[in-house]
Swiss-Prot record:
<feature type="disulfide bond">
    <location>
        <begin position="30"/>
        <end position="78"/>
    </location>
</feature>
<protein>
    <recommendedName>
        <fullName>Class II hydrophobin 5</fullName>
    </recommendedName>
</protein>
<keyword id="KW-0964">Secreted</keyword>
<feature type="signal peptide">
    <location>
        <begin position="1"/>
        <end position="17"/>
    </location>
</feature>
<feature type="disulfide bond">
    <location>
        <begin position="39"/>
        <end position="69"/>
    </location>
</feature>
<dbReference type="InterPro" id="IPR036686">
    <property type="entry name" value="Hydrophobin_sf"/>
</dbReference>
<keyword id="KW-0732">Signal</keyword>
<comment type="function">
    <text>Aerial growth, conidiation, and dispersal of filamentous fungi in the environment rely upon a capability of their secreting small amphipathic proteins called hydrophobins (HPBs) with low sequence identity. Class I can self-assemble into an outermost layer of rodlet bundles on aerial cell surfaces, conferring cellular hydrophobicity that supports fungal growth, development and dispersal; whereas Class II form highly ordered films at water-air interfaces through intermolecular interactions but contribute nothing to the rodlet structure.</text>
</comment>
<keyword id="KW-1015">Disulfide bond</keyword>
<feature type="disulfide bond">
    <location>
        <begin position="40"/>
        <end position="52"/>
    </location>
</feature>
<comment type="similarity">
    <text>Belongs to the cerato-ulmin hydrophobin family.</text>
</comment>
<dbReference type="InterPro" id="IPR010636">
    <property type="entry name" value="Cerato-ulmin_hydrophobin"/>
</dbReference>
<keyword id="KW-0134">Cell wall</keyword>
<feature type="disulfide bond">
    <location>
        <begin position="79"/>
        <end position="90"/>
    </location>
</feature>
<dbReference type="Pfam" id="PF06766">
    <property type="entry name" value="Hydrophobin_2"/>
</dbReference>
<dbReference type="GO" id="GO:0005576">
    <property type="term" value="C:extracellular region"/>
</dbReference>
Amino acid sequence: MQFSLALVTLLATAVSALPTEEKRQAYIPCSGLYGTSQCCATDVLGVADLDCGNPPSTPANATDFSAVCSAIGQRARCCVLPILDQGILCNTPTGVQD
């Protein structure tokens, strides 16, 4: 009886000493219909954005997405359909301040 109590106590101590694993979700700036992340220079009434391209690096969060695009003189956008460096139907990603 005492042996089993000692064994349970030992196992409980060992389990409580194990570090917890923290899993973080990857940042996905654009999803759904507006699923293409772009850095665009000019916004035309929210219908089209001019001089758009893919972000030069993968953003880690909304602030980083804005900073990555700002570093090349553009703004972070989520577009429906980028065609020939033009973003069609673009909006500002969640968490990004214009």
